[in-house]
């Protein structure tokens, strides 16, 4: 989670469309409160979107058009690029949060993992 404030557009537009996270509401708020343990939810150590992205390593981000966190993923991608970090964003049509890994036979799963493997091969070597 890159932004615990719930300020991303898709927290609203994809509510009830994301069949994994469903909606950012009371349950997520309670989990966020537990996770933050009283700290400011805008603290970059908790919500990296509010931090400095300079010096980050090359990054690959994966989301779906129905992902509750899609807008946050897009915002992180833009912030990484603005900081001069090589960043790749893959977005899969009709996919909910992390749905690409739930069905090993889905074409999106194969494509996601092929792209991720290729990204790691390029940056970490074979």
For the regions a language model picked out, list residue spans one by one.
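Alpha/beta-hydrolase superfamily serine-hydrolase fold, recognizing
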Residues: 1-126
């Amino acid at each position: 989670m890159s932004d615990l404030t719930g300020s991303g557009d898709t927290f609203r537009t994809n509510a009830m469309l994301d069949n994994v996270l469903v909606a950012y509401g009371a349950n997520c708020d309670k989990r966020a409160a537990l996770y933050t343990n009283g700290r400011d939810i805008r603290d970059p150590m908790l919500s990296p979107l509010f931090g400095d992205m300079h010096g980050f390593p090359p990054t690959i981000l994966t989301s779906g058009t129905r992902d509750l966190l899609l807008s946050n993923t897009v915002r992180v991608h833009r912030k990484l690029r603005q900081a001069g970090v090589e960043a790749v964003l893959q977005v899969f049509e009709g996919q909910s949060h992390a749905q690409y890994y739930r069905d090993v036979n889905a074409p999106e799963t194969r494509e996601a993992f092929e792209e991720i493997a290729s990204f790691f091969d390029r940056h970490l070597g074979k």
